[in-house]
Amino acid sequence: MVKSEALCERLVERLELGEPLSVIAKDKEFPNVSTIYKWCRKDKTLRERIMEARKQGVWTLLDKIAEEMQIPKTPQETHFLREKYSHIRWLASKLA
């Protein structure tokens, strides 16, 4: 697959929305994860854009979870959401 600015922009947009790179790479529109990492090794600007998009994506996920927490849940759903929130919060602390 050939790297293009349009493809990289779509990749960045999806990362900003909180989608994991592994999920995005399964989409036929995108190359596999190893190809994306290869591009990043060769292109410092792309690498920086992707890292910033991933940081933004974590904040997007925090916002989504904060929204979800406003809706009443069963105890089991609450436990799952709490675990998910803890993981996202941990990611945010590592990327900050």
Task: State each model region's role.
Residues 4-5, 9, 13-88, 92-96:
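Charged, helical or coil segments that form electrostatic protein-protein
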